[in-house]
């Protein structure tokens, strides 16, 4: 299964159970159909690889629960020595809760606005990040491209580092589109 995290496995298990319940026990789903379908499965914006050199992932986790699941998935699935987070959050979301949940994997953070009038102000997000992730370097960027430049430079300065863009579904989409426009060739 090409997805990361226990929560994704649980979601797939529930989906298979729903299909089996719909068709009934007299029409089981053939194993080869499941294998083929799961082998082609993608979940855009969920630990999606969008760049290499350095490695850059994007995830649309935008609440504390999703951020905790993301931290668990990153910890279980990857062996990054250090991770730079690019974080943008919408004003109506629990930014402090998201940042606290991300703290265990945050070695460097660049906050950025989301391209939306509902975006949380970057300076406020920076203050929240300093409180939620004490002792971690926090940068403020005026845009996602600037934030990615900061994070990529930091991650490229040492082996074992990577970048993770997180905090908003809109930010995830923006990062995927930006990676395509830059010709990173993955997303």
PLM region spans:
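Active-site-proximal loop/hinge segments that shape catalytic or ion-binding/gating pockets
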Residues: 168
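Short helix-capping segments at alpha-helix termini
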Residues: 26, 78-82, 130-135, 183-184
